[in-house]
């Protein structure tokens, strides 16, 4: 399908404005990846996202790179970073130290996650005194913030001016890794909200009805926080299969087959852009407050999707630009 498919053009510029736009990036794991990573960030910044989340790595193994990446985003870019925090791979002391470090660096938003267990440790449980769930992690983050505010009046004022926000994960299709159904995940989200979660970002799904049904069920039981759909560009069948193996969320076979049948990556990119723009259009029609795009540190697939929706990069915008509202 051509990129000029008008049936799905520019929903963000109609009744849905203002919508939230955000990206997930993974910190570079070695020095040779630093330059391409920051080039990708710069390209993403040109479409004026509201925030950018930085992963922490399975088992917390990328924690030092994540901390350095988040600090640089705070210091050198106009973006509001969301710092991922996980229970797996971290003692309580390490989590507390990381929260203090992030808060001291100017971070005001966290994504509290249980995290993926290390390979071969699928039955992971926290050690004595460890943090075992996203709910416990929310409590810990807010406890650290309170201690800082109690100890320093200036921090209390800053907190009043820019309140701490904590995002959590939501699983519209259920969580195969935890063996939970969508209904059970709604109840889990309600518990996270009660613990102090500010908003939720969903795990992957491939049908807007999955998202819409989850949100409807969540609202019926009292979940009031925003639920932002998390979406992955469908341009690489091998990557989709790896993500399926990691998350347990089944990728529709027609999607994998269609991508595999295209002889060139250019055609797969075009198909993925149209598929992604249609999915975004559908979730916005269902009332989504915006979209969170999983980039895998590749700017082109997400920018292709956004271009179909009328979101164009600003060629003059740089990392040092001032924040501004998307037109």
What residue spans do the PLM features occupy?
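Short, well-ordered coil/turn segments that N-cap beta-strands
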Residues: 16-20, 48-51, 77-81, 106-108, ...
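Short, acidic/polar
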Residues: 31-44, 66, 92-99, 180-191, ...
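Conserved N-terminal beta1-alpha1 strand-loop-helix module at the mouth
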Residues: 2-51
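Active-site-adjacent beta->alpha loops and helix N-cap segments on the catalytic face
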Residues: 10, 32-34, 60-72, 91-97, ...
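Catalytic beta/alpha-barrel core
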Residues: 51-62, 85, 111-113, 198-207, ...
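Active-site pocket-lining/capping segments in soluble small-molecule metabolic enzymes
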Residues: 3-11, 32, 129-152, 156-163, ...
């Amino acid at each position: 399908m051509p990129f000029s498919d008008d049936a799905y053009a520019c929903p963000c510029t109609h009744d849905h404005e203002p919508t939230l736009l955000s990206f997930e990036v993974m910190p570079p794991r070695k020095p040779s990846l630093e330059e391409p990573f920051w080039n990708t960030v710069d390209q993403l910044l040109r479409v004026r996202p509201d925030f950018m989340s930085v992963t922490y790595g399975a088992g917390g193994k990328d924690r030092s790179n994540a901390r350095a990446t988040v600090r640089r985003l705070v210091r050198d870019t106009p973006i509001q970073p969301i710092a991922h925090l996980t229970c797996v791979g971290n003692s309580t002391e390490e989590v507390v130290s990381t929260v203090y470090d992030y808060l001291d660096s100017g971070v005001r938003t966290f994504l509290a996650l249980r995290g993926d267990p290390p390979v071969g440790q699928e039955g992971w449980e926290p050690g004595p005194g460890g943090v075992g769930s996203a709910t416990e992690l929310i409590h810990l983050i807010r406890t650290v913030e309170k201690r800082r505010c109690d100890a320093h009046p200036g921090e209390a004022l800053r907190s009043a001016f820019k309140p701490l926000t904590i995002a959590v994960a939501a699983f519209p299709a259920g969580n195969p890794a935890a063996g939970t159904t969508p209904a059970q995940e709604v109840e889990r989200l309600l518990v996270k909200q009660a613990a102090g979660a500010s908003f939720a970002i969903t795990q992957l799904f491939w049908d807007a009805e999955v998202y819409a049904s989850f949100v409807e069920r969540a609202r019926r039981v009292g979940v009031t926080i925003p639920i932002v759909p998390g979406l992955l560009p469908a341009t690489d069948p091998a990557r989709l299969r790896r993500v399926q193996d990691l998350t347990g969320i089944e990728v529709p076979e027609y999607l994998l087959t269609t991508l595999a049948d295209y002889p060139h990556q250019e055609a797969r990119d075009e198909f993925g852009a149209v598929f992604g723009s249609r999915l975004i259009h559908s979730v916005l029609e269902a009332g989504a407050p915006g979209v969170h795009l999983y980039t895998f540190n590749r700017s082109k697939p997400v920018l292709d999707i956004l271009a179909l929706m009328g979101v164009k990069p600003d060629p003059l915008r740089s990392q040092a630009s001032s924040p501004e509202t998307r037109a």
